[in-house]
Amino acid sequence: YRYSTGLSFIYPDYHPAATSGDSLRLLFEFNTSDLLFVNNDSAATGSYAISFALYKDMESKLIVDSGVRYFTCSKPLEEGFRLRGAIDVVAPDSFNYFMRLDFSDLNRNQAVTDIIIIDRTGIQSPDKFLLVDAYTNAPLIRNFSDRPTNVRIVQNSDTKRPVFMRYFKTDYPIADP
């Protein structure tokens, strides 16, 4: 879910990835053309911040973990470059969480709020698996790809268990999973 108080120019994508029993790595990605870059002494730089608050459930007022991370980046040479990063969060296993994320462009003084649900229950939780590009090993954070991509499914957690998948191929004209 995404919320903005006015016209929004920022469209970040997030993906929670469980790393161990009490740790979660929040992967984020956005297009650098969404940021406002200002000229400093030698180069154009963009500044942004991501603040987060992790709640036990939607109606809870108890915050499990929270924080703000500040970032600065130089303007890339190519247009449409997607910048990636990660934030480590404390999220004990066996709960479903509700996370509020505020992505702020500090040069433009504009923010957009996203809300994501994090599933940390069961051994087949979707947050314990990550889809990566087979050639570059870069995580695929968005739910779609703009080009044909070979992918691998990797398990994020420390314990290595077999992964069971069901794959359906039908003649109905729907894209394969």
List the predicted regions and their residue ranges.
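Intrinsically disordered, low-complexity terminal regions enriched in Ser/Thr/Pro/Gly
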Residues: Y1-P177
